[in-house]
Amino acid sequence: MIDRYKHQQLRIGLVSPQQISAWATKIIPNGEIVGEVTKPYTFHYKTNKPEKDGLFCERIFGPIKSGICACGNYRVIGDEKEDPKFCEQCGVEFVDSRIRRYQMGYIKLTCPVTHVWYLKRLPSYIANLLDKPLKELEGLVYCDFSFARPITKKPTFLRLRGSFEYEIQSWKYSIPLFFTTQGFDIFRNREISTGAGAIREQLADLDLRIIIENSLVEWKQLGEEGPTGNEWEDRKIVRRKDFLVRRMELAKHFIRTNIEPEWMVLCLLPVLPPELRPIIQIEGGKLMSSDINELYRRVIYRNNTLTDLLTTSRSTPGELVMCQEKLVQEAVDTLLDNGIRGQPMRDGHNKVYKSFSDVIEGKEGRFRETLLGKRVDYSGRSVIVVGPSLSLHRCGLPREIAIELFQTFVIRGLIRQHLASNIGVAKSQIREKKPIVWEILQEVMQGHPVLLNRAPTLHRLGIQSFQPILVEGRTICLHPLVCKGFNADFDGDQMAVHVPLSLEAQAEARLLMFSHMNLLSPAIGDPISVPTQDMLIGLYVLTSGTRRGISANRYNPCNRKNYQNERIYETHYKYTKEPFFCNSYDAIGAYRQKRINLDSPLWLRWQLDQRVIASREVPIEVHYESFGNYHEIYAHYLIVRSVKKETFCIYIRTTVGHISFYREIEEAIQGFSQACSYDT
């Protein structure tokens, strides 16, 4: 059993037959070695107890009830007395029944069987390593080829003259005679290479380092040749080069992980613990069983039949043996991955069997449902909405979610401040939603970050930490700048919120996972906190006021909204006098008092460098005053000059939206400059 405190990661890969045997076999106190499942039975129909050496055997997988053997005897678990720790009659150990969740068994296959994941899935790892067409290998595995080229190094009978009684006849009539003789096994083991055993022998003879060297040499030669001018030949060269790259990467992976290629062919088939493939009794005495049990039974039936053909019957035709080996291969394929690149196997009710691959893969599989994405305490879920007023490292948490997530902390705070005498009184105060509850909740949230996660979590920025604040409503408020890391938008997306409990988790959330600590992409280093989607729309609306200058806006139809109560005809739009402001604070104050709109054009006094103004630009209008002063009005600015042509002041034509946008950028630059000065 894996200790979760000693192991920080889990790797799935190929293992050797010796490792499978070490996982599944155990030595009981009387010295007997158990672990091999030899019978396809589950429970006895009369006693309703597991069959010995069957798929639910208590000797192999442990007792069904803790401390009770198959005979019904009971022993206290962990008793230090000299009583035997197993039943001498049935051979069942007196251990905890939870052992049936992780104790494995194995099936000793009579013939080698290729692992269907490495043969039929694309790209085929076996075909890549052997550099042979997949169809040819499939025909060899499923015994569609009567014989293959001998791979033994010894001299073969097929190469010697006079080996056949009917030497005059052709090979077409001579070879089938060997498939019906009593010495077929000897002949086949020496002369014919077929089935998964042939694949295993070829994989065992591979030298991975030589494969890497030869593939690299061939890849360089193909690269030096250059284009041939024939499109078909050029495509073949490109495909061959891609294949060589995949082959080298695969060989390097096998070397790096200390995996032998022949392990892709199975000699021992692991049997899952019985608690992971249960049989449940429902109302009416009916039994519900996992499909994997039926698939295991099919494998054992066919494997035992093949064993009988090879051991008990000396005169079994060779074609029958090869056919039975093919059935064993197909049964194991169905167990591991039913219907892979073919018609799936169905039961009597025309229902597709759920294989091992179906159990572990997908959203409802073992990994994503119960290991990676299982439901946990101190977590919640809700729809996200935009929170533009939030800081980058903050998120808005609804009161309903926050009080549930931090309820234990609030209860502790109420008791510590002597506002509640016990847990029951504290819970009643929380249910009544007293004001003191929200005050304590805010105190708790100030020192406790939360984790936000949006599925699917494809990279590390899919889960980040934030400082929560209470908001009204039932939705989670999120700053729009962090959307790109989550790949989120505000069209109904949901996010999960988690509370880190341990000090290590809280420290990691604060130092590594805060959103303002993850401004760059960890993959390529580009900025990840960039305006996207709703923020871009907001910036567009904020700055879309004076794009066409004074000439186009003098009689702009957009000005009609300032005169909504007056009747305005399409041919004569009423002109709105544009107000003048001395500073940005007055302009924003007028907007807040609703005297002007967000995109209403206005004149703002500005300290503008004279060099920015083009000397050749001609004013659109010139307004003269009685004292001789005059205003030169350009497309986007206005200059007030004296009689002596001295510049008094300059006004720029802008909107409240532009002013707000400029102030935000200015504050951000100043804050960044201050932070840099502190660091230096």
Swiss-Prot record:
Query: GO MF annotations for this entry?
Result: DNA binding; DNA-directed RNA polymerase activity; magnesium ion binding; zinc ion binding
Q: Name one Pfam family in it.
A: RNA_pol_Rpb1_2
Its biological purpose? DNA-dependent RNA polymerase catalyzes the transcription of DNA into RNA using the four ribonucleoside triphosphates as substrates.
Where is it found, in Gene Ontology cellular component terms?
chloroplast; DNA-directed RNA polymerase complex; mitochondrion
In the record, biological process GO terms are:
DNA-templated transcription
Documented EC number(s): 2.7.7.6
Predominant place of localization: plastid
Q: Report residues binding Zn(2+).
A: C69, C71, C87, C90
Question: Which key words are in the record?
Answer: Chloroplast, DNA-directed RNA polymerase, Magnesium, Metal-binding, Nucleotidyltransferase, Plastid, Transcription, Transferase, Zinc
> Oligomeric state and partners?
In plastids the minimal PEP RNA polymerase catalytic core is composed of four subunits: alpha, beta, beta', and beta''. When a (nuclear-encoded) sigma factor is associated with the core the holoenzyme is formed, which can initiate transcription.
Where does it reside? Plastid, Chloroplast
- Determine if Protein transport is one of this entry's keywords: no
Q: Does the keyword Zinc-finger apply?
A: no
Its family?
Answer: Belongs to the RNA polymerase beta' chain family. RpoC1 subfamily.
The Swiss-Prot or TrEMBL record lists the needed cofactor(s) as: Mg(2+); Zn(2+)
Name of this protein: DNA-directed RNA polymerase subunit beta'
